[in-house]
Amino acid sequence: MISSKPRLVVPYGLKTLLEGVSRAILKINPPNITQFAAVYFKELIVFREGNTSLDIKDLVKQFHQIKVEKWSEGTTQEKEPECMEEQVETSVVSQEPTRMEKSTDTEEDNIAGPLFMNKTTQFPSVHAEVLLEPEETPEAACGGSPKPSTPKAVTPPSSPSPAAVSQEFAYVPADPAQFAAQMLGNVSSIHSDQSDVLMVDVATSMPVFSEEVLSSEAAEDARVAIPSVYSAEVVALQVLSQTSVHVDLGPKPKDDEAEPTTASSFPLQDEQDPPAYDQAPEVPLQADIEVTSFVHVSSIYNNEPVIEGVTYVEQIPEHIVIPFTDHVASLKDNEPPDSPIPVACDTGMSEKTVGSVSLAQLEVESHYSSVHMEAEASVLFSDTSLKGQPAQFPDAGGSTKAVGSEKPLHLEVEFTALVPGNSGQEESQGSSAAQEMEVKLVLSGEAATAVLSAASVRAAGGSPTPVPEGLTEPELEPELEAALEQGLMKPDAETTTV
C-alpha cells in the first residue's frame, strides 16, 4: 500500500552551508547573529564567483580557510585590549574593600579622612611677643600633641586644666561643647597680670588682635581739644614729652571719647602709672626702635580744614607705637603777613601723652623716649583786648575759674617720620588722612601752655582739660622777648578773629 504522506527531500549542499555558517558563528561569536549570517552568505557568493568550478563542499571549506579565519583573527585582536582594560579595572576595584563587618562598621569609619580631624591646636599669645622668629613659628604651630583620627572611644577627650597650659599658649579643644565652656569662663581673664592669652578657633588660624588694642584707632578719628594759655602779644609754643610707648589693655570705652592726657613739667619716670589691670606691663623700648617725627605748623586763611595724612601702627615686642604721619597743621586765623616766630616742638607719643610747655627751643636726647616728634610752627596772635586780664586755670576737681576769655581755633598737623638708623632719610607715607583739632586759648601773663589731649571734644566752649599738679610756666628767653619788642603785635584796637 502506497503512503499518502509527502517525502521531504533535502537539497544537495544545504547541510554543508548550514554547518559552515554555524561553525563561523560559534568561532567568531558575533553580537548580532542575523547580521553576521547575511554578511557570511554575501561573502560566500562573491567567493563562489571567483571559484565556479569548485563543489559546494570544497567551496565552503576553502571559504572558511580564507575568509572566516581572517575574521576570527581580527576579532581576537580587538578583544585582547578590551580584556586587558577589564582586568585592570577589576584589579583596581579589588583593592578596595567590598564588604565590611557589622561589628566594626561605625559612624566614624564612614567619615572621610580630610573631613574628620580630632587634633588639639595651640597658638602663641600675641601679647607675649608680637614679632616671632621664622624658626619658632612652625614649632609653636605644631606644639599640640596629635591624636588618632578614629579613636575607639566615642566620648571626646577631656581638656587639660588651665593651670597646666603655658601662659603663651591657649588650649583650644576640638569638641564644640568644651570650646564653648572654655570661652565662657573656664580660663583666666585676658586682662590678668602677665597671663594674656589669645583664644583662636581651630577653624580660624588667622592671628587677631584684641578689641582693646583696636579701640585706640577709633580715638584717632575723633576731635582733640588743646587748651592753651597764651599771652596777649605773641604765642610761641614748644611741647616736650618723654615717655615709653605702651598700650592699655583695659575694657573698650563705650563712646568715642578716650581718656584725656595730662601735662607736667617733670619727666614721666617721676609719675605713677595707672593700676596694673588697666594696662600691659611697661618695658622700656630699645634705642634701635626709636621713631622721630618732624611737624611743621603754618597758618592758613580759609575756614575749611585741609585734611590730609594717615596714621599707622608700628608693632614692636610688648608695645604698639602709634605715631602720626603726613598731617598738615595750621591755625585757622586771619593772620597778618608779619615775620613768623619759629617754634620747635619735641613730643614723645604714647597712649597717654604727657607734655610740658616751654617758649624756648629745647633739644631732647634720644635715650629719653622711643618716639620723638619735632615741629616748627608759625603762630601770631594780636588781641590786645585781652591784655591785662588774668589767666584761667582749672582746679583739681575739674571746675574752672572764668578769669579770661576763650577762643576756639582749628589746628591741623603734618608729621614726617624719620628713623634714627637712616640719617637724613625720610619715610613719608604715600596716603594722607586728616585729624581736626580744636584749640581753646586762655589769657595768661607771660607763659603759654599746650596740652595735647586724646579725648574727643566736639564743643569749642566745653569744659577745659584739667591741668595736673606740678604744671609750671616757663620764662621767656631773651631772644623771644626781643622778637616781641620788634612790633610783631598789632595795635590795641585791632582784634584777631579765631
UniProtKB/Swiss-Prot annotation:
Spans traversing the lipid bilayer: none
Keyword Calcium listed: yes
Record GO biological process: sperm capacitation
Residue numbers spanned by region Disordered: 74-107, 135-164, 247-279
Post-translational modification: Phosphorylated on tyrosine residues during in vitro capacitation. Dephosphorylation affects its ability to bind calcium.
Subcellular location: Cytoplasm; Cytoplasm, Cytoskeleton; Cell projection, Cilium, Flagellum
Keyword Calcium: yes
InterPro entries: CABYR (IPR038848), cAMP_dep_PK_reg_su_I/II_a/b (IPR003117), DD_CABYR_SP17 (IPR047579)
Residues in RIIa domain copies: 12-49
Tissue-specific expression: Expressed in testis.
Gene3D superfamilies: cAMP-dependent protein kinase regulatory subunit, dimerization-anchoring domain
GO CC annotations on file: cytoplasm; cytoskeleton; sperm fibrous sheath; sperm principal piece
Compositional bias annotation for Low complexity: 145-164
Note: On the 2D-gel the determined pI of this protein is: 4.3 to 4.6, its MW is: 97 kDa.
Purpose: May function as a regulator of both motility- and head-associated functions such as capacitation and the acrosome reaction. Binds calcium in vitro.
Binding partners and assembly: Interacts with FSCB.
Name under which the protein is recorded: Calcium-binding tyrosine phosphorylation-regulated protein
Gene name of this polypeptide: CABYR
